[in-house]
Amino acid sequence: MATPAVSGLSRQVRCFSTSVVRPFAKLVRPPVQVYGIEGRYATALYSAASKQNKLEQVEKELLRVAQILKEPKVAAPVLNPYVKRSIKVKSLNDITAKERFSPLTTNLINLLAENGRLSNTQGVVSAFSTMMSAHRGEVPCTVTSASPLEEATLSELKTVLKSFLSQGQVLKLEAKTDPSILGGMIVRIGEKYVDMSVKTKIQKLSRAMRETA
């Protein structure tokens, strides 16, 4: 039998599967909408955590949950569809008790187990992280270069990219390397995408030469 707390979170999740306006209005809407099953669970959790002022705590706990579920000894029985649900719940209860997770995180895990959605856990964690990133005003930016950028170049690039942000927004920069682009860089910031790689320039030159042949 589901606990009252689990049932409450379950009701919030279900209301996102319907078009009933009144229950939807009672939820605290996240700053960004994430679609799909994972998005519905994450939105319900965001609403509950926001009302209790525990967004940061839940975010930290969810990252720990994702880490735990990557451990083979845990993932094998918990994510195996042929293992009885009661065994999964017992294993999860042991984990949540050991980690001393908050009731919000514990209830989410129990709800996912109850609904046979444990395989969606990583997706829920990712969706919640996306909401929290938007909550903090973070703008994700990925810079891909053929080789690691020098600190001076990276610092100058950050200054340029920050000039495109609105007030209150925070740049969250991730630098990656991909030798296949040959040189230059590829920048993705928010919804914008700029390809300044040597590889793309060569491809454009090749197409142009074929068209004029």
Curated annotation (Swiss-Prot):
Family note: Belongs to the ATPase delta chain family.
Oligomeric and partner information: Component of the ATP synthase complex composed at least of ATP5F1A/subunit alpha, ATP5F1B/subunit beta, ATP5MC1/subunit c (homooctomer), MT-ATP6/subunit a, MT-ATP8/subunit 8, ATP5ME/subunit e, ATP5MF/subunit f, ATP5MG/subunit g, ATP5MK/subunit k, ATP5MJ/subunit j, ATP5F1C/subunit gamma, ATP5F1D/subunit delta, ATP5F1E/subunit epsilon, ATP5PF/subunit F6, ATP5PB/subunit b, ATP5PD/subunit d, ATP5PO/subunit OSCP.
Protein name: ATP synthase peripheral stalk subunit OSCP, mitochondrial
Post-translational modification: Acetylation at Lys-162 decreases ATP production. Deacetylated by SIRT3.
HAMAP family cross-referenced by the UniProt entry: ATP_synth_delta_bact
Family annotation (Pfam families): OSCP (PF00213)
Residue window of motif SIFI-degron: 5-23
Sites of N6-succinyllysine modification: K90, K158, K162, K199
Main location: mitochondrion
Compartments (UniProt record): Mitochondrion; Mitochondrion inner membrane
UniProt keyword annotations, A-Z: Acetylation, ATP synthesis, Hydrogen ion transport, Ion transport, Membrane, Mitochondrion, Mitochondrion inner membrane, Transit peptide, Transport, Ubl conjugation
InterPro entries xrefs: ATP_synth_OSCP/delta_N_sf (IPR026015), ATPase_OSCP/d_CS (IPR020781), ATPase_OSCP/dsu (IPR000711)
Signal peptide limits: none
